[in-house]
């Protein structure tokens, strides 16, 4: 969405947008095909911290294809880590770095490139090269959201985004958050601010996505319920549009629904079927450690208000706080389960750059991985607690979730909005998955099953691009320790470990297929 929004603000250049996530295993050949077909002068990338290595790999491919291509990096990681990128080993991969919001800065940069670099030093938020060294222009003020046109969805080269088995799209109705959560990097991107897009613009954006086939829309707002009156107006506006068979999912804090439980009824009428709630933790002590404004009471009241209307609640929780141990993590999952929530997106506390939590954990000597950002995706541990090493934290979190939450079970909301798929899951696929899990656990053991699943997670951001000569400042792995081979465990190698000794000896010479 961010790239399509930037494209919509550019009038004087031919811009196309592609999302490499859709490609997965075919990412490299398809990217090279795009370069051959379009022969671009400039290739821009956006990246979260955990995606940076992959992004650098694509920039390398672009430079190898044509050394005259100008490469640009924007997004969260570029904003938070611009100094390190500008002086690090990847400096040769990037010609420009865009810090902060790029809605208009990208177009200004393109105009300057076309004009031979004239006025480059006047583009706020831009870092560019002079004689091979990066020069950082002053920071860019926050944009006036009333000036930003809706995303240019016609510029997308790739289709195939789905959610709940429906064609999906994304919108934003606001930017920023006023909360002071110390693990979050939003303040480094937007400051402590909360800005609203005009309601008319939001509704036009929804209609545009719908006209292009979207039947499920995800709202990407950082905290859409900071202004509950405005959120109510949004629901009323969507109801007036009368768009048939359109559903919504959003992310929010439970606080707003605890104070305004009545809005849940309008949400359902507008088409909101599910919501990702930043619950974060079931411990008052840990909520205070994270500087969360939530209390256990507001969390429970907010969840109850949504569940009463049949809205599916997806709980976002964080483990790996400084004093966490197996018992506190078990209590965290049990708190979620006791509220009747079966969809859980759990993460391990990640020390993102420029966050207060990172500084606090470094001072307390809790950070285990400072610079290998491949693992900064929430799935893997990059910290240690007072009770657990990074490897122990990773395994214990996985095991306790498996024991307490277990496999997903349908809630009343699932039966209400997705009855057919829910029947299929509850009466067929759930039993197949359960049997598969039991067999895998029987064959490989609990630790073997854990390693196989971690190996699957490793592939989520692995596009198979290697940059020759690129070195890592530190060698880190959250599952195997710092000096082990992260891909050594395959189904075959783990099976051999489980076999009785004579069979292991007999099979010793048989290679493990990678």
Feature annotation, model-predicted:
Residues 70-72, 98, 249, 276, ...:
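Structural detector of well-ordered beta-strand residues that form the stable sheet scaffold
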Residues 81-82, 179, 229, 285-290, ...:
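Flexible glycine/acidic-rich beta-alpha junction loops that bind and position SAM and/or redox cofactors
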Residues 21, 48, 76-77, 220-227, ...:
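Short, solvent-exposed turn/loop segments enriched in Gly/Ser/Thr/Pro and often Arg
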Residues 84-104, 264-274, 331-346:
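Structural recognition of alpha->loop->beta junctions
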Residues 2, 6-141, 348, 354:
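Glycine-rich beta-alpha loop elements in corrinoid/cobalamin-binding modules
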Residues 38, 66, 89, 212-213, ...:
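A structural signal for short coil/turn segments at secondary-structure junctions
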Residues 146-314, 319-321, 326-334:
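Radical SAM [4Fe-4S] cluster-binding motif and immediate context
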Residues 12, 32, 41, 93, ...:
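Radical SAM enzyme core and accessory elements
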């Amino acid at each position: 969405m961010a790239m399509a929004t930037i494209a919509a603000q550019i009038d004087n250049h031919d811009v196309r947008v592609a999302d490499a996530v859709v490609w997965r295993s075919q990412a490299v050949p398809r990217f090279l095909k795009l370069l051959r077909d379009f022969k671009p002068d400039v290739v821009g990338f956006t990246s979260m911290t955990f995606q940076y290595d992959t992004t650098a790999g694509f920039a390398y491919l672009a430079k190898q294809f044509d050394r005259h291509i100008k490469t640009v990096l924007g997004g969260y990681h570029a904003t938070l880590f611009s100094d390190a990128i500008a002086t690090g080993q990847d400096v040769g991969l990037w010609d420009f770095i865009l810090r902060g919001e790029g809605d208009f800065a990208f177009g200004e940069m393109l105009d300057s490139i076309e004009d031979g670099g004239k006025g480059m030093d006047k583009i706020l938020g831009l870092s560019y090269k002079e004689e091979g060294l990066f020069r950082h222009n002053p920071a860019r003020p926050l944009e006036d959201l009333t000036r930003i046109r809706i995303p240019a969805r016609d510029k997308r080269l790739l289709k195939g985004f789905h959610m709940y088995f429906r064609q999906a799209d994304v919108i934003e109705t606001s930017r920023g958050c006023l909360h002071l959560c110390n693990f979050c990097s939003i303040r480094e991107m937007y400051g402590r601010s909360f800005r609203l897009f005009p309601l008319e613009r939001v509704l036009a954006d929804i209609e545009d996505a719908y006209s292009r086939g979207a039947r499920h829309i995800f709202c990407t707002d950082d905290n859409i319920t900071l202004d509950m009156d405005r959120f109510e107006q949004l629901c009323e506006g969507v109801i007036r549009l009368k768009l048939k068979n359109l559903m919504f999912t959003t992310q929010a804090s439970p606080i707003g629904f605890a104070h305004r439980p009545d809005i849940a009824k309008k949400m359902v009428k507008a088409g909101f079927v599910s919501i990702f709630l930043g619950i974060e933790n079931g411990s008052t002590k840990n909520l205070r450690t994270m500087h969360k404004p939530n209390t256990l009471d507001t969390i429970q009241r907010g969840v109850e208000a949504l569940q009463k209307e049949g809205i599916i609640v997806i709980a976002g929780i964080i483990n790996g706080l400084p004093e966490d141990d197996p018992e506190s993590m078990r209590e965290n999952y049990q708190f979620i389960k006791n509220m009747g929530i079966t969809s859980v997106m759990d993460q391990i506390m990640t020390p993102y750059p420029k966050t207060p939590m990172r500084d606090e954990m470094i001072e307390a000597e809790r950070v285990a991985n400072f610079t290998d950002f491949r693992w900064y995706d929430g799935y893997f541990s990059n910290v240690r607690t007072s009770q657990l090493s990074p490897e122990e934290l990773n395994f214990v979190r996985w095991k306790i979730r498996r024991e307490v939450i277990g496999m997903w079970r349908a809630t009343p909301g699932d039966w209400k909005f997705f009855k057919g798929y829910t029947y299929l899951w509850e009466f067929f696929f759930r039993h197949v998955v359960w049997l598969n899990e039991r067999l895998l656990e029987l064959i490989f053991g609990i630790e073997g099953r854990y390693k196989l699943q971690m190996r699957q997670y490793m592939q989520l951001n692995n596009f198979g691009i290697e940059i020759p000569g690129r070195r890592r400042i530190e060698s880190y792995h959250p599952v195997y320790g710092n000096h082990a081979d992260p891909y050594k465990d395959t189904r075959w190698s783990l099976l051999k470990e489980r076999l009785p000794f004579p069979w292991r000896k007999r099979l010793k010479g048989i290679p493990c297929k990678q």
